[in-house]
Design a protein with these regions (language model features):
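Vicinal oxygen chelate
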Residues: 1-11, 21-117, 124-129
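Conserved beta-strand-loop-alpha-helix junction that forms the acyl-donor binding cleft
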Residues: 15-16
Length: 129
């Protein structure tokens, strides 16, 4: 499957958005693009990794959207294309990410799976050349 630019951005809910910003930068190499505090409180932020982007906010039981650490289950994961899965895996492991599946070769490329500080699953893949 060729890598193409997407205009769909996952919106991920965290218990502590500033902590998630720091952790995703350190462990997964994301870059903070913006953060804002809406009038009703909480925080909204956006991050990028290359030309891929994610959004995040404070979880809210009122909206029925909370982190996996609070709900004890994840209902979605984030799939990210990378240039070098093995290098990324080493960085994530060194930063304390929970590695679910070590790097391995699959029909769709080289891939590994990790969980972030709130338990969201992340699937990192380098497509076949």
């Amino acid at each position: 499957m060729p890598v193409t630019k997407t205009e769909i951005f996952p919106y991920i809910f965290y218990r502590d958005v500033p902590a998630a910003l720091e952790w995703l930068t350190r462990a997964f190499g994301f870059k903070e693009e913006m953060r804002t505090t809406p009038p009703d409180g909480g925080m909204h932020a956006e991050m990028s990794l290359g030309d891929q982007r994610i959004m995040m906010g404070q979880g809210s039981k009122r909206w029925g959207m909370i982190s996996p650490r609070e709900s004890a289950t994840a209902t979605m994961g984030v799939f990210v294309y990378l240039e070098d899965v093995d290098k990324h895996h080493a960085r994530a492991r060194a930063a304390g990410a929970e590695i679910v599946d070590a790097p391995r070769d699959e029909s769709y490329g080289r891939t590994y799976t990790a969980r972030d500080l709130d338990g969201h699953p992340w699937f990192f893949t380098t497509p076949p050349r």
